[in-house]
Amino acid sequence: MAREFTRNMLIMLGAIMVGVVIITYFIGDIINRSTIETMTLQHNVEIVDINSRNENFTDYCLQGSIKMDSAREVREIANYYFDFALYWFNNALVTSNKNLTAQSIDNCTKAMGQYLTAYQNFGKSRPYFEIAKNYTTKTQYLEVLGYYIGFSQAGQNITMLRYNASDYLRRAAENLSFGHMENVTALMANFTIIEQMVQGATQVYNEFRYQIDGYLFFSTIREVPDQT
């Protein structure tokens, strides 16, 4: 009886040990599976977050670039009208031809409208680049976004200066058509002061332009190099 009891006890202990091993295995397997599922979920969340940040960064950069490209193109059109306005004005000074002063006034008016549009578009582009900075931590990207923001500010500065210069030139042409030479002289003195300011603003503008045009992901606009 004692031997039979001992044998049964050994069998029970063996069965219990096997059961413990099996249970331990299943518990470990469940824990491992749970850990893997948790890591996979975290990984997927991180991927979604990265993709979302990349999409937002690209979207804001693209929208800002579209506004900026438009501003640059419109500024070139404004420069075209401005150059003709000054050309007709200088000829009118020599010939006293009212048709030429009318041409100057017309081109000044068109230039002012284009400069104002360019000014507004430069301003509209800046917030997109500022927001894009929230979606990247890369030093290079933050650096180039800083150039974009600086360029938009420089663009607003130069277009507003030229808007004011066009206004003085237009008023000078109007006074020239009436023969009010004292007014013409005073207005052209202010015009000259602003044009001197334009030269400094153009230098700053071009420095930012060369910086951003050096980056491959910037869609360059073939602007006519500024001579002033």
Per-range role (PLM):
Residues 60-67, 71-91, 114, 121, ...:
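C-terminal amphipathic alpha-helix
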Residues 31-109:
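Immediate post-signal-peptide N-terminus of mature secreted/exported proteins
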Residues 102-113, 145, 188-189:
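Short, charged, amphipathic alpha-helical segments
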Residues 1-39, 118, 228:
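Secretory targeting signatures
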Residues 97-100, 140, 147, 151, ...:
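Short, solvent-exposed helix-helix connector turns and helix-capping sites enriched
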